[in-house]
Amino acid sequence: MSEGKLIKRSVFFISDGTAITAETLGHSLLAQFPNVDFDIHIMPYITTEEAAMNIVEEINQCQSRDGTLPLVFDTLVDPNVREIINTSKAVNLDVFEGLISKLEQVLGTPPTTLVGQTHAVTDSEYYKARIDAVHFALDNDDGALTRHYDKADIILIGVSRSGKTPTSIYLSLQFGIRVANYPLTEEDLDDNRLPKVLKEHKNKLFGLMIDAERLVAIRTERKANSRYASYSQCQMELRAVEGIFISEGIPYLNVSEMSIEEISTRILQMTGLKRRIG
C-alpha cells in the first residue's frame, strides 16, 4: 500500500430491527481505525431466511470485488437467520451472541427471543419522551422559538456552525432531553453580553467552542470565499464568545476533535442532566 492511501473494506450492519444498535456499536469500533476507508451497508429488518440469503449473496459479491473479507456486525435474534448470514465470506461479528450468553450465566435466567426488540415500542412512556424531545429540539432550533425556553432542560449556545443543532438532535433522540439552541450572532458579540432572552435562562446555558481552523473549514463548505468563512472573522467571533462564557460563568466545551456522541456524553457529565430514556 502506498503511503497515505487508505485501506478499503466493506462493512455490513445487519439487524432484524432498525439496525441502530449494530450501527452505533460498529461505528464506535470502526472509528478506532482512521486509516481504513469503510464502505458501509446498512441492512435493517432482516427477519426471513430468504432475506438473509440475499444479504449473503451481496456480501459475497463485495468479497469477490474487494479481494478482502467484509466485516459483518449483526444483532440477529433468530438463530436460523443468523446461521445463514454466518455462511457468508466475511468476518462475522455477532454483537449480541457473546454478551447474551455471558449475561444468561450471570443472571441465571434465559433471554427472550423477540425479534427486533432492541428498539421496539415496548415502553410507551419512553417512546413518548423521545418523540416529545425530538419535536422540542426541532421547534427550538437556531433560536426559532425563544418563548419556550422555560420548558428546556438545556440551551446550547455558540457561534454559527459550532455543532449546536446535531448535538441537540442527538441529546433528544438518544436521551429524551429537551434541548434548545441559540446562535450568538455578530450583533450579540458586538454588545459583549448575553441577549436578554438568554439571561433569563442563564442557569440552563451551555456553550460550545470550536477551534478557528475547524470553524473555517465547516463554514467554507457552506459559503466559500466569504467574510463569514474567513479566518479573521471566525477568530474574532470565537474570542468574543469565549469571553462571554467566561465573564458570565457559563460552562462550555471545545468540541473541535469530538464526535457528537462524545460531546453529548461530556455535556451530561458536566451538567448533571438526567436522561429520560436510555
UniProtKB/Swiss-Prot annotation:
GO terms for molecular function: ADP binding; ATP binding; phosphotransferase activity, phosphate group as acceptor; protein serine/threonine kinase activity. Its EC number is 2.7.11.33, 2.7.4.28. It is an enzyme of class 2 (transferase). The keyword Transferase applies. It holds the Pfam family Kinase-PPPase. The keyword Metal-binding does not apply. It catalyses: [pyruvate, water dikinase] + ADP = [pyruvate, water dikinase]-phosphate + AMP + H(+); [pyruvate, water dikinase]-phosphate + phosphate + H(+) = [pyruvate, water dikinase] + diphosphate. InterPro entries: Kinase-pyrophosphorylase, PSRP. It comes from the Bacteria. Keywords: Kinase, Nucleotide-binding, Serine/threonine-protein kinase, Transferase. ADP binds at residues 158-165. Bifunctional serine/threonine kinase and phosphorylase involved in the regulation of the phosphoenolpyruvate synthase (PEPS) by catalyzing its phosphorylation/dephosphorylation. NCBIfam families: PRK05339.1 (NF003742). Belongs to the pyruvate, phosphate/water dikinase regulatory protein family. PSRP subfamily. This is Putative phosphoenolpyruvate synthase regulatory protein. It comes from Acinetobacter baylyi (strain ATCC 33305 / BD413 / ADP1).
